Amino acid sequence: MTTINEIIALAERAKNNGINRIYCHHTGGLYKMNSVEKAHYHICIEGDGTVRINGELSDYKEHTWHRNGGAIGIALCCAYGATVYKNPERINWNGYPPTPIQVERLAEIICFIATVLEIPIDSEHVMTHAEAADIDGYGLYGNDPDMRWDLLLLDDPGTGKKNQPGGDVIRGLAIWKQNN
């Protein structure tokens, strides 16, 4: 199991490399990381909360269309066969939703990386792939056949509320962890 000290050391090694954004994803796979996911994301979080580091944070990884430079890609291993509908409250996770421990670990990792790299935990610097896709025109309400909706909605482990905006959940938990 990867420790917080390992995450902090990883972030320390990435200082002064121009990293100023973090993008959060789901892999569209099972709860275990595979070789394709390892190639695309800096960090993967498996269904049981196991954290897998895939190189250095300064390594170039292709995770978010036109947003890979100066960015870290972190993915939750989940959402195998999942589908979303134009009514976003109608997500079919196909038995592989993000687990509460994955969401907690994601927020924890963001908290420590953002602190070390001095990345503000706000909607400009830490976002889900769904949020980036909406900005860039290939989100849920665009017409792109390669639409992305990664972590559009999440259950909030802090409040117990279901189907909350994913970016808000992640940032809120990360900020809470940063302040406590």
Language-model regions: role of each:
Residues M1-N16, Y85-N180:
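Basic/polar, cationic surfaces and motifs that engage anionic cell-wall
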Residues M1-N68:
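N-terminal catalytic cores of peptidoglycan-degrading enzymes
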Residues R21, A71-G73, H125-M127:
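Structural preference for beta-strand elements that scaffold enzyme active sites
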Residues G29, A79-G81, E131-D134:
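Acidic glycine-/aspartate-rich tracts in secreted/extracellular proteins
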Residues H66-Y85:
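Short coil-to-beta-strand
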